[in-house]
């Protein structure tokens, strides 16, 4: 199910808990890309099943991390308050390098931040995390269909998502869900296509770029093909 290290990973099923294999790497500061992905998905399995451990959230952890950070995953997620990466992946302080914006869309600032996580902090995994019933996708669809002006700087979000969302509106199924998944795929491609820092590490096998979707109803994360 997991591609070889360095690939742009894609799948369409929920990944079951990896159990002891993941736990063995839980405190490692330099996991492989595959180990990092398994650790994330195992954490989500714990959270979604009501068995979250809430690790690395003590004052001792605060003091331990004061001298530096070694996150094992780089997250490009939506700003939606219901999708906080540390919570849904059952992680804690210093575990994830978060980059969040409405619609989880890559612009130059977000790309620079993600590259910082890769280049300076050595994260072996990037996850583009979309989610069910995304408000930014919904707003983009409404703007396309009605032609109504979008207020303020929200228009910048809609303009960024429009080229991704518009082509899938004629597809069968729920348009918002189609847009969510199309956007995840598009941002995965954009990270590799626009960043030589990311592309070089992907080709070297030291970095994976993964698309994923969070289900608001079940709390489960699935990888997006």
What are these regions (language model features)?
Residues 1-70, 94, 103-112, 116-123, ...:
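Divalent-metal-activated hydrolytic enzyme cores
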Residues 90-98:
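Short helix-loop-beta junction
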Residues 128:
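Conserved functional hotspot residues or short segments at active or partner-binding sites
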